[in-house]
Amino acid sequence: MIPKMDTEAYLDQLLGVGRFSSLKDGLYVLKLFSGVMVDIVMYMTVLRDGTVKTRVEVVNWGAIDNTVIHEETISRERACNIVRNQFYVASALTNVCRDFMEKAVGELSDIENSTVEGDIILDYQKVVSLGQFEVEVLYNSGGYECTLYPMYAEQQKFYTKDIDRVESFLSKMKKKYDATVKRVVEEELSKIGD
């Protein structure tokens, strides 16, 4: 059998396992993680020699550009094992989101108690997506309302006038979250062998 067709036959047998599906001949998609406005997806392209080129992207549904966080060419066996063991990656990413949400709640609670008053920007609006939750910041009658929207829990609201601290915190947290997600995806994929 031709190596490409052989690999496709193996992968076709796994269609429907978890969140693994086929887009077209030789192109497969594995949704590793579902977030509020952000998903983490692995695209698998079967090459002529039967190997599989993988590309993991953070798909941001609110923006046009996606971020590539991992690429490699792997064997057919390893591709099949990744599909079978996808839930380990999803579980690790869920733990990352939970940890970051706890940090966000703690920090926003601290900021809420701040007596510092920042600039007043009447039309201020900012939304930061961090996997399974989002933080929205709006100016509202003399202060800023920070609303945390988790996927699986009730929203939480925090009020502050210290917008500089909120912006600084959200910016640092987003960078740290992105770096952590990349590291965790690479670590979890490296654990899955042939």
Q: Would you name each region that the model predicts?
A:
Residues 1-37, 88-129, 189:
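Negatively charged, low-complexity tracts enriched in Asp/Glu with abundant Ser/Thr
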Residues 4, 48, 70, 113, ...:
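Intrinsic disorder/low-complexity segments, especially N-terminal tails and targeting/processing regions
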Residues 6, 33, 55, 128, ...:
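Residue-level detector of intrinsically disordered/flexible regions characterized by low predicted structural confidence
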Residues 8-15, 76, 80, 84, ...:
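Residue-level detector of alpha-helical secondary structure
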Residues 14, 24, 32, 47, ...:
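Generic alpha-helical secondary structure signal
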Residues 17-22, 36-42, 52-58, 106-118, ...:
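Generic structural motif
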Residues 18, 26, 72, 79, ...:
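Small side chains
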Residues 38-85, 133-171:
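Intrinsically disordered, low-complexity regulatory segments enriched in Ser/Thr/Pro
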